[in-house]
A protein has these predicted regions:
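Cytosolic, long alpha-helical scaffolding segments
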Residues: 1-217
């Protein structure tokens, strides 16, 4: 049997690493939000810088997830919900992968190949919503060690934003087909939009995983 204080220390240690992981993902998301303005300014140097920085963040997130895996293995049954914690860590890591993927595609986007279209503004709006979801997710993870009930409540805001992303994704996809003449333009923009939408979906999945942890605390 483990003492309650030992269990509490073990829980705090693992949740601290999970919080570091979520924070690093948020930093990457914020850089993604800076990538789009750089695209509109046709600032290729800035685009490349952001893409490289986000790739570094993706590596950092993977390392933190590996650290958490080792920690959970060492603590063993002392952490009763370790499978749930590990699942959440993998879900958060996957968000970083989608952010990196979207940033890479934006960095390779050739603005000069596109006619002026309000669709780019709509794309920026979807990106902003997805980044806001990552911010809210970070708040949820932080709340785990302070007030698990609050963490559960905060996930509702993530669900609401995800529905907005879905609505804008569908509307933007229809606009692509009706407003763009070039099949190449449609494919490129649709690819970017899908990556951002996948990022939002993954945020919701991670929030669900964290809710399971909160229910056990």
């Amino acid at each position: 049997m483990f003492s309650s204080s030992s269990e509490l220390q073990a829980r705090r240690k693992t949740l601290s690493i999970l919080q570091d992981e979520a924070k690093r993902v948020l930093e990457a998301a914020r850089e993604l939000s800076e990538t789009f303005p750089a695209l509109l300014k046709n600032d290729q140097e800035a685009l490349n810088k952001y893409a490289e920085s986000i790739m570094k963040a993706e590596d950092d997130v993977e390392n933190l997830r590996r650290m958490l895996t080792r920690e959970l293995a060492e603590l063993g049954p002392m952490v009763i919900n370790r499978e749930d914690v590990l699942r959440a860590a993998y879900d958060i890591e996957e968000i970083a992968s989608y952010i990196s993927s979207a940033a890479f595609r934006l960095a390779g986007f050739k603005l000069k190949d596109f006619k002026k279209t309000p669709l780019l503004k709509d794309l920026g709006s979807v990106i902003d919503l997805a980044v806001e979801m990552v911010y809210r997710l970070n708040e949820v993870v932080r709340a785990l060690t302070i007030n698990p009930s609050l963490a559960i409540d905060l996930t509702q805001s993530i669900q609401k934003i995800e529905r907005q992303v879905d609505d804008q994704y569908r509307a933007l996809t229809l606009k692509l087909l009706s407003e763009l003449d070039s099949f190449k333009e449609v494919l490129v923009l649709k690819d970017i939009i899908e990556r951002v939408e996948n990022m939002a979906d993954q945020c919701l999945k991670a929030a669900d995983s964290i809710t399971i942890i909160a229910l056990s605390l």
